């Protein structure tokens, strides 16, 4: 809240005017607050100067003193405003009263010196008068008569202040100045030269570093190109080894094994033992005709047509007889020929006929399979099963992964080489 000067306004103004009036004997007035309010009242006035006023200051209150003193330099009256905040005042009251200082300075206007005091050391009369003397400016006195003129006899002639210019000293002084100017210039040039050399060395080191990096990069590129072929072959070999190990670790499907054997045997039977020789369709037909009786007859019966073939003269194509003998020598045993010459459809029908008898309740459930190994699902999109479990409703989505309903009815993916189809 703002300070209240209107409640006790006439008394405050009267005390202030008594101090300002030079004809009045009152030379100080003291103001303070009424209790804890912001109303200002007159705490006291006096004619005893600073010594008397200092005795009235209370260490537990916030007070404002306005004094009239005489300037020790000029002898003119000066006014001093003292903002007193006692050491016993609490911090809240100090903060509230700090905003009133400017208002009180406006009311007690005309002060030449303003002092903010908190302890008795700040309001000692000697200290206050020193501040007044410093604030008055030049040390001079008024209304003091100077000593009267006294005749002391003839005065000596006034001497000239002219001094002849000394060329030597002037040259020395100028030379000294030029010497120091030259020294400063040389020092500045030396610093600039050192800075320039340091910059050149830095640029040279940077250039050498870049060239070294370029050379090293070129060498690395050259070594990489030289070793590129060997590294590529090595990588291909390692990849092939990894694929081979993975293929060996994965269990093979029985049907795949059977197909691989069938393809291998068919390739062996079709391939020619001696490439480059011509085959006669007529002789090949003669060899394929007795296949059926060969599988039923004894070895003696089989050797009889071979002897007939060798005795029959073939003058027109003599090389073909040699080829016939060689083909006859490399023929597979009759049992193996009979086994692999049977139609695949008949074998599949025979192989699939047995599981159908063992699983009669799978009709209408789509493509079904029997688990050969146990498998645990890696996530919720896969199914788990144990050996001999049945998987129904299979969808062939990939060569290595199928989808179907597991034993628990959950639909998900599973590896194709872990099951065997039931047809």
Curated annotation (Swiss-Prot):
Top-level taxon of the source organism: Eukaryota
Residues under site feature: Cleavage: 357-358
Coiled coil: 180-227
Residue numbers spanned by region Disordered: 185-204, 240-318
GO CC terms: anchoring junction; clathrin-coated vesicle membrane; cortical actin cytoskeleton; cytosol; dendrite; early endosome; Golgi membrane; lamellipodium
Domain SH3: 364-423
InterPro entries attached to this UniProt entry: ADF-H, ADF-H/Gelsolin-like_dom_sf, Drebrin-like_SH3, SH3-like_dom_sf, SH3_domain
Subcellular compartments: Cytoplasm, Cytoskeleton; Cell projection, Lamellipodium; Cell projection, Ruffle; Cytoplasm, Cell cortex
Keyword Cytoplasm: yes
Basic and acidic residues bias (residue ranges): 240-264
Modified residues (Phosphotyrosine): 330, 340
Residue positions, PTM Phosphoserine: 160, 266, 269, 272, 280
Domain ADF-H: 2-133
Modified residues (N6-acetyllysine): 176, 285
A GO molecular function held by the record: actin filament binding
Topology of this chain in the membrane: Peripheral membrane protein
Keywords for this protein: Acetylation, Actin-binding, Adaptive immunity, Cell junction, Cell membrane, Cell projection, Coiled coil, Cytoplasm, Cytoplasmic vesicle, Cytoskeleton, Endocytosis, Endosome, Golgi apparatus, Immunity, Membrane, Phosphoprotein, SH3 domain, Synapse, Transport
Single biological process term from Gene Ontology: postsynaptic actin cytoskeleton organization
Assembly and binders: Interacts with SHANK2, SHANK3, SYN1 and PRAM1. Interacts with FGD1, DNM1 and MAP4K1. Interacts with ANKRD54. Interacts with COBL. Interacts with WASL and WIPF1.
Family, as annotated: Belongs to the ABP1 family.
Domain notes per entry: The SH3 domain mediates interaction with SHANK2, SHANK3 and PRAM1.
Family annotation (PANTHER family): CORTACTIN AND DREBRIN, DREBRIN-LIKE PROTEIN
Protein name: Drebrin-like protein
Species per Swiss-Prot/TrEMBL record: Bos taurus (Bovine)
């Amino acid at each position: 809240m703002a300070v209240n000067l209107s409640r006790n306004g006439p008394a405050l103004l009267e005390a202030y005017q008594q101090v300002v009036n030079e004809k009045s004997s009152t030379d100080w007035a003291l103001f303070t607050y009424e209790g804890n309010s912001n109303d200002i009242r007159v705490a006291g006035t006096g004619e005893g100067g600073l010594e008397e006023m200092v005795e009235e200051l209370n260490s537990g209150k916030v007070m404002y003193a306005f004094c009239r003193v005489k300037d020790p330099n000029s002898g003119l009256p000066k006014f001093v405003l003292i903002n007193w905040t006692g050491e016993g005042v609490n911090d809240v009251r100090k903060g509230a009263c700090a905003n009133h200082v400017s208002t009180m300075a406006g009311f007690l206007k005309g002060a030449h010196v303003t002092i903010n005091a908190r302890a008795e050391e700040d309001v000692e009369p000697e200290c206050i008068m020193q501040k007044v003397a410093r604030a008055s400016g030049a040390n001079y006195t008024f209304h003091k008569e100077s000593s009267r003129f006294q005749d002391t006899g003839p005065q000596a002639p006034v001497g000239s202040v002219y001094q002849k210019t000394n060329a030597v000293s002037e040259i020395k002084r100028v030379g000294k100045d030029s010497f120091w100017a030259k020294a400063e210039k040389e020092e500045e040039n030396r610093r600039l030269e050192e800075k320039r050399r340091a910059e050149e060395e830095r640029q040279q080191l940077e250039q050498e570093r870049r060239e070294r990096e370029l050379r090293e990069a070129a060498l690395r590129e050259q070594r990489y190109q030289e070793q590129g072929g060997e590294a590529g072959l090595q990588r291909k070999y390692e990849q092939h080894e990894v694929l081979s190990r993975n293929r060996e670790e994965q269990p093979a499907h029985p049907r795949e094994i059977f197909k691989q054997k069938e393809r291998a045997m068919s390739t062996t039977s079709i391939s020619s033992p001696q490439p480059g020789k011509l085959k006669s369709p007529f002789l090949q037909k003669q060899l394929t005709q007795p296949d059926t009786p060969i599988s039923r007859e004894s070895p003696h019966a089989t050797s009889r047509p071979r002897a007939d073939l060798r005795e029959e003269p073939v003058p027109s194509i003599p090389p073909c007889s040699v080829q016939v003998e060689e083909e006859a020598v490399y023929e597979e045993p009759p049992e193996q020929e009979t086994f692999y010459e049977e139609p695949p459809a008949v074998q599949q029908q025979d192989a699939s006929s047995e599981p159908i008898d063992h699983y009669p309740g799978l009709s209408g459930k789509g493509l079904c399979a029997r688990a050969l190994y146990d498998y645990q699902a890696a996530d919720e999109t896969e199914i788990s099963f144990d050996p001999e479990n049945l998987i129904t409703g299979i969808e062939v989505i990939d060569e290595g992964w199928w989808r179907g309903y597991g034993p628990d009815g959950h639909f998900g993916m599973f590896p194709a080489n872990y099951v065997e189809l039931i047809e």
